[in-house]
Amino acid sequence: MIVWRRRLPSMTLVTAILDLGRGEIASWGRRPYALYTTGLAQLLSRYRDVPVIVHVTAEDEPLVWRTRRRDNTRVVPTTRATLGALPWHGRVDAIRTSPSWADRAEWLRESPQRLLDGYLALVLAKLRWLCDAATANPFGTERFVWMDGGLPRNPSYARLSRRGFVRGLDVERFRVLSVPYTTNEEIHGFDRRACAQYCGTEFVSWIVRGGLFGGTGAAVAEVSELYDALLDDTLAHGHLGTEETLLTILAHRHPTLFQRHCLEGNR
């Protein structure tokens, strides 16, 4: 039996939640914002002995201090305006709102990434915020791990948020989790054939999941630099996916930098 008090490796967790209106969309991707607030509350309590950097609005900040101490927690004020100021927001939005992008798959037309302004900007910002944490390193830790604020409430991936799972990950470079992915003509909106070309493979048979990833400070900095360059290049060529698509490409291109743990099935 795993006891939560057992110490984890020296690490800083980075997370975020932001109400983008997902609870109001009339499609299969609708989720109440309470799912994210309760998930974040679970995460903050579960890792209350671990340094955490949280990106939230001023309205959600009281949730953080219900369970967290000031000496091991930092709050980064984050709003929709924060997302709008990201350097890639305009280019992302131009592709997101184009009919040609939405027509790549039926599911994409009604997806949160298509319908919600700020959704793609937020998920694409995860690595930047992780790198910011590694650069500042306010708690003097050796590793930096991104965990989605809603991960503890995700029906397919909640187990990845448990202390026992995180403790079992050997993070010596840049650790990612992958799943088999062999269907669809696109990968989160990114043309599958183009993705394979970027990956340097004939066919992309697995993708990286974006709910949990991280590494040493040096590895995070190196991956972040590669990620920013790749994001610029793919957007310049009209390609748009999510952070999972970009991390998938980088994990294929740089296998010695990445440590990949394959999860069972598409979960």
Tell what function each PLM region has.
Residues 175-187:
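Short beta-strand-to-loop element that shapes/binds the nucleotide-sugar donor at the catalytic cleft/hinge
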Residues 2-114, 121, 125, 133-139:
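N-terminal anchoring/stem segment of glycosyltransferases
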Residues 118, 122-177:
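GT-A fold catalytic core of metal-dependent nucleotide-sugar glycosyltransferases
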